[in-house]
Structures are given as C-alpha cells and as structure tokens.
Amino acid sequence: MDADGSTTDASQLGITGDYIGGGHYVLQSSDGDAEGSLASGDHDESCGSKDPYREQDIYLPIANVARIMKTSIPSSGKIAKDAKECVQECVSEFISFITSEASERCHQEKRKTINGEDILFAMSTLGFDSYVEPLKQYLQKYRESMKGEKGINATVVTTTDAIPEELTEESFSGPLATSIITADGQQQNVMVYTTAYQQIPGVQPIQFT
C-alpha cells in the first residue's frame, strides 16, 4: 500500500499521535515529508502537528549507560557513540524482557505487585542463572538496610515520647517571691513558680553563660 493509502487508513481509524505514543513507533523522514509518516487528517493541521514518539524516550539516560560502561575499560579508553547507543537499547530491551516474565508470574498468582523474588524467578526461568545468586545476596542486604533505617526511625520516636506532655504539681519547685506595682501605684506580692529540670535521655542540656 502506498503512502497516501496509509495516511487515509490512519485517519479513518482515528490513529493520532497519542495512540502512536502508547507503544507504536514512527520513523519520520529527515525532509519532513508528511506522506512518509502517519497523520491524523485535518485535525492535526488545525491544532498543529505533534512530534512523533521517539524510541529514545523509553531508554535509560545514555550518560548513565556510558558511565557504567567506562567502569569496565581502562581510564585511557574511549567508547564510540554507536557503541553507547547499542548498549543503551540492549539494556532497555533486557529490562522489558525480565519484567515481562516476572509480570507473567504475578498474573498467574493473581498478584498486582512485582517483588524481588519475581525478578529472581524470571532471571532463572530465562536462563540467567549466573545472575540469580549475586542478586539474591544484594536483595537480602537491601532489605536488611531498610530494616535498619526503620529501627533508627523507631528510636527517634521513642525518645520523643519520653518528653513529658503534662506538668504535675511535683514538677514545680523553688517558688520565688517577688512583687509587682499595680496600675493604682500599690505594691502587691506574688509568688512565681519554676519547673524542676528533668534530664531527658539522649538530650544534652543547654549551658547558659
């Protein structure tokens, strides 16, 4: 089918740039020829043309990929641009490949959340057995570190709860006698009570000089 026929079919089906961005990729010609790509008819002409969905938008940042690649070569080594882009695409495909297999397991077990065990299962099922054991150790260390952070947060909450919220009669001590002068010029004696200092565990007292 020629280009004009493709354009007509796309318009009749209501295929717009939003549909294309949902997972269908378009290669746009360098000279911007409208007949070489899918269009949405007069609607796009009135509202302005939309940029086609780029495959680069679903890839990991190429700077991050290049940084990881450089850790495996000598400091004086260089990596060509096409090599970076090739690895960038391979990594993205690998992630989709593993995630799809893990998602299939969740679907069979009627679960909605993919966890670490699902990823390990997918790696083993797809033949990446050499990755399973190192990733299992990493997953265990990661979960232990998360438990440690929760323990620190619990300690902070416990220390905060140790601060008294109510002042009882025993907490007042050392009444100080003083006097004030009222508006009519008469002197009136009053008693001022101060609170006793309580040492709170884990809190250093403030020294005034």
UniProtKB/Swiss-Prot annotation:
Residues 60-66 bind DNA. Residues 144-209 are annotated as: C domain. Disulfide bonds: none annotated. Keywords: Activator, DNA-binding, Nucleus, Transcription, Transcription regulation. Residues 54-143 are annotated as: B domain. CDD domains: HFD_NFYB. Pfam families: CBFD_NFYB_HMF. Residues 41-52 have a biased composition (Basic and acidic residues). Residues 87-98 are annotated as: Subunit association domain (SAD). The keyword Plastid does not apply. It is found in: Nucleus. PANTHER family: CCAAT-BINDING TRANSCRIPTION FACTOR-RELATED, NUCLEAR TRANSCRIPTION FACTOR Y SUBUNIT BETA. Can be divided into 3 domains: the weakly conserved A domain, the highly conserved B domain thought to be involved in subunit interaction and DNA binding, and the Glu-rich C domain. This is Nuclear transcription factor Y subunit beta.
